[in-house]
Design a protein with these regions (language model features):
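Trp/Phe/Arg-rich N-terminal binding region typifying the photolyase-homology
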Residues: 1-109, 204-205, 209-316
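A charged, amphipathic alpha-helical module
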Residues: 91, 95-213, 238
């Protein structure tokens, strides 16, 4: 299960997070404090940005009903020591999970889980490709719903559902986003009303999750999981020399024949804000117009966004 907040009425979280914190984390903290997340066994929090680092401690002291397992991912991924370090981080997480569940992860189970997740990645990548060929059916809201649903299903069950959707799409005649997420649905409705279709995305909440498989060999389960992190690319939360994300987006635009790029800038998201000038510069040099929109799941007024999207759509 993935925690991406929601339209929470921020009250209790104000005691733990400042108003300029990421709205997703504000909502997650509020839901943890007000009991919405009660029933969860444990929460794993990766310390990938300043707000997430604060969340590890805020959750530990504020949400006592739900244990928290922190994990710090290495950013100097070229160093051999980074692999060993990440394995040790995973081992600590497993100890916390064993304390909560009463069972230690078995190597055989971990290997099988990796296979299940890799199969799910492949199904989701195929869906993203097929969706671009059926934009009359897979509207922005439908596409988002399919992608987001993966966070709330057992992966094996969700894989089967996606495979069935893919098979149905294949029977039909064939007639890009970047950022963290593109919610709530009002934003997707605005895009659809302005005849903007999504042919690809680079959202953390969506396709970025399925871009990199865990290696099928190369050691035990934990080592292979660590190698998967080392193999990730094109994400603002991962350090990469030379800022290659722009060229990656250009290649995506060319492959999917995109007309432009909408940058979904999560409010108060420092890692995304650091990346934005670089990839927008590269995209504009390549001839792709860019529109940067602020994503705030707590917002309820979208008139200004509607005007900006209308103006952007008139470019094409």
């Amino acid at each position: 299960m993935g925690l991406f907040g929601g339209r929470a009425d921020i009250q209790l979280a104000k005691s733990y997070l400042p108003p300029f914190a990421c709205p997703v984390m504000q909502a997650n903290m509020e839901y943890g404090l007000n009991g919405t997340y009660d029933g969860m066994s444990v929460v794993i929090i990766p310390a990938l940005c300043d707000t997430l680092r604060c969340m590890t401690q805020n959750w530990r002291f504020g949400v006592k009903k739900i244990p928290m397992a922190p994990i710090v991912y290495p950013q100097n991924r070229k160093s051999p020591a980074a692999l060993e370090y990440l394995i040790s981080e995973y081992e600590q997480v497993l100890v916390i999970l064993a304390t909560v569940t009463g069972e230690m992860m078995k190597e055989r189970c971990l290997q099988e889980t990796i296979q299940v997740y890799n199969a799910h990645n492949a199904a989701m990548r195929e869906f993203a490709d097929l969706a671009a060929d059926h934009l009359d059916i897979i509207t922005p809201k439908v596409r988002h719903a399919v992608m987001k649903s993966a966070w709330f299903y057992e992966k094996g069950e969700h894989t089967q559902i996606i495979k069935e959707i893919n098979e149905e799409l294949k029977k039909l005649p064939v007639h890009e986003f970047t950022g963290i997420s593109c919610e709530p649905d009002e934003i997707l409705d605005i895009l659809e009303k302005n005849n903007i279709a999504i042919v690809a995305d680079d959202l953390v909440q969506e396709s970025q999750q399925y871009r990199t498989d865990t290696p099928s060999n190369g050691g035990g389960g934990l080592k292979r999981l660590a190698k998967q992190w080392m193999g990730r690319y094109g994400c603002s939360l991962i350090h990469e020399e030379g800022k290659p994300r722009g060229q990656m987006l250009i290649d995506m635009c060319r492959e999917k024949k995109a007309d432009g790029v909408i940058s979904c800038m999560m409010k108060f998201c420092d890692p995304e804000e650091y990346d934005q000038p670089y990839f927008e510069r590269d995209l504009r040099k390549a001839g792709y117009p860019c529109l940067a929109i602020e994503i705030d799941p707590l917002n309820t007024n979208y008139e200004q966004l509607l005007t900006r999207v209308q103006a952007f759509a008139e470019l094409f």
